[in-house]
Each structure stands twice: as structure tokens, then as C-alpha cells.
Regions:
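Conserved beta-strand scaffold positions in the cores of enzyme catalytic domains, especially
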Residues: 31-33, 51, 68-70, 116-118
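Flexible, polar/low-complexity N-terminal or interdomain linker segments that lie immediately upstream
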Residues: 2-50, 54-62
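Residues within alpha-helical segments
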Residues: 40, 69, 105-106
Length: 123
């Protein structure tokens, strides 16, 4: 019985560690969480992508990734359709610590975007 409990606990831990994706229950589209290094590789090798900075105006003004578009996470729902017309476009999302980029990525998925990669914060 102890072995079964141990296996269940290990399984739950594994699922929680590897299940870091947002899922839209209707269409099972997810965003991918990537590292900052993976995001940099994409920026260095790909041509057709958009970078979303999910921070505030003030944070953006203090410094941001070159060519990033400022759409604070709390404005994604109202601005995405207009500013991001191609829902299949590769979109890289970041913020300061990673919390807002996750929220923004989840919202993009809910809005129907299919190629969202979230790379956390830039602290």
C-alpha cells in the first residue's frame, strides 16, 4: 500500500511539473512555456514572429526587448484582435517575473491564437 501511495505522489508531482501549459477546454489549444534562451534562439533565427511585452507602460518605458509590442496583460482581451490579426502567427510573450506573461498567454489562447510561446520574466 505504501508503494502505491508513493507512486501516486510521484505521478502527481510529475504531472504538475510537466503540465505547465494553458488549455482551452473547447479546442485543446495550448501555449508553450519556453526558456529565455529558446526565445532568443527564435529571435535570432526566425523572421516571422511578434514579441508581446505584458508589463505596464512605465516598465516598458524603462527598457524592453527590441521590437516588442506593449500590450499589458490586462489589455490583451480588448487589443489582441486589432493588433494581432493573424491567429496562427508565432507570438512570444514576456513580462517582468513571469506571472503576467502566463495570464496574457492564457488569454491569447482563449481568443483563438494557436502559436503562443511564453518565456517568463526578464528580471
Amino acid at each position: 500500500m505504501k508503494k502505491v501511495k508513493g507512486l501516486i505522489i510521484m505521478l502527481l508531482i510529475s504531472l504538475s511539473l510537466f503540465g505547465i501549459t494553458a488549455c482551452d477546454g473547447e479546442n485543446n489549444v495550448t501555449y508553450e512555456q519556453i526558456t529565455a534562451e529558446q526565445a532568443k534562439t527564435i529571435m535570432d533565427t526566425e523572421k516571422d514572429y511578434i514579441i508581446i511585452d505584458a508589463r505596464t507602460d512605465e516598465e516598458f518605458a524603462e527598457g524592453h526587448i527590441e521590437n516588442a509590442i506593449l500590450i499589458p496583460e490586462y489589455e490583451i482581451a480588448e487589443r489582441a484582435e486589432k493588433e494581432l490579426p493573424d491567429k496562427e502567427q508565432l507570438i512570444l510573450v514576456y513580462c517582468r517575473s513571469g506571472r503576467r506573461s502566463k495570464i496574457a498567454s492564457e488569454e491569447l489562447v482563449k481568443l483563438g491564437y494557436t502559436n503562443v510561446k511564453e518565456f517568463g520574466g526578464i528580471i
